[in-house]
């Protein structure tokens, strides 16, 4: 087993120009063209020209998956090293499944667009919210949520790094939670610019629809294990993988535990396979001893290749 893991980012890492570091790479362009043909949307234009549509969740989810798969394919052109374990943050879990061979690229695109649609439709505009709480431990944030929920939904939903936790639920409850978090000593409590309160109980109606859709999606045993967000475990059974994807919609993203689990399996090099450097930054805060390269350019791919050759 080699000592390499790839992490795949989710929503929030998208930006116009996010693939610029790859120049006019043929494999990148071809991957975007393939996806555009499947969904009937010009995703390359969306990724390269100034627009707001890249931030609409029904576009963001597919384009982040496309970008991650394109980066993976660009890696395959320059190197033969295959990671021994994969993980993705929220939407990134789907990208990881594609790279693992458990889900086809062609099937993944309409699947994540459908996921985005049912998430968007599960909660009327203005009803849900999310906020980042900085500087409190996990148990304190959970207690803040329990105390602030009253008759609403309010949950700790993303455990991103020690002291960086995202809460989600009904907007009024999130606002109460932010105020109480500050009283409890949070360094900051920041509302997030999202319209969908992901990974909380408000997503259960969406999860039921996703489960129905997944019945007709072919999933096979991944060739590379994928650690799932909902329970920090990997599966080789299609039904268990589908169940993990469904539960993920209304369960917390246990990212701290995920990175720790990867590290305890003997991984010595991580890479963030997709746009941005969010997961690379989180990795450093979770396990300082685990270096993580952000694969955002041709140069970064060569840097990673060089690191692997010298180790």
Predicted regions and their residues:
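Short hydrophobic/charged patches on amphipathic alpha-helices used for structural packing
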Residues: 256-260
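Non-catalytic positions within long, well-ordered alpha-helices that form the structural scaffold/packing
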Residues: 182, 263-266
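Short, flexible loop segments at boundaries between secondary-structure elements
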Residues: 231, 291-311
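Short, low-complexity, intrinsically disordered N-terminal peptides in bacterial proteins
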Residues: 1-3, 310-311
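Short, solvent-exposed amphipathic alpha-helical segments in soluble enzyme
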Residues: 23-24, 147-149, 182-184, 285-288, ...
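FabD-like malonyl-/acyl-CoA
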Residues: 2-141, 192, 269-299
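Alpha/beta catalytic cores of group-transfer enzymes, especially the acyltransferase/condensing modules
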Residues: 11-13, 100-251
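Conserved functional loop/turn residues at catalytic and ligand-binding sites
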Residues: 90, 218, 266
